[in-house]
Amino acid sequence: MKNPLFIALIILSSNVFAGNILTGKVTSVIDGNTFEMLADDNDSYKIMLFGIDCPEPGQEFAEKAKKTLEKMILNKKVNVTIQGKDRWGNRLGVVLIDGTIDPRHDLLEAGLAWTAERDPIQELETIKEKAREKGKGLWKEQDPTPPWIYRRQQTLTQLKSS
């Protein structure tokens, strides 16, 4: 006879990893591309939107990106398809609201995000380029600083002041 606890653990873990899909309610928005959710399995998860990067706190449009994401997903039920983890262990996910609305598209269309620095997704790159051509959001600037460059600059500044 199989151990009931072992079977329960297998069933619960399959809910999280089967197809890498999490379903739950967004409990907080950390920044323009990061949020926390309480999944239906009662575990909390920190999720970063896969394939985009929004301005960092301290950069122009960071607060607007955060507020835009809050309006779209805070306290709403979402489905998150986990794509993997970044080098810091953060879960990267594709989020759908009501099964069809992808907040990455809205952030890119409004000019509030860049596509990923490495291996950009062509669909997202196309949306970003349209926003750039129209001069939306951060693309009003001649040469806005991408968040990955900003983070590196901040790290160097901190190292120099230490």
Residues of each region from the PLM?
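Short, linear, compositionally biased motifs with a strong N-terminal bias
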Residues: 10-11
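Small beta-barrel nucleic-acid-binding modules, primarily SNase/OB-fold domains
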Residues: 2-5, 14-162
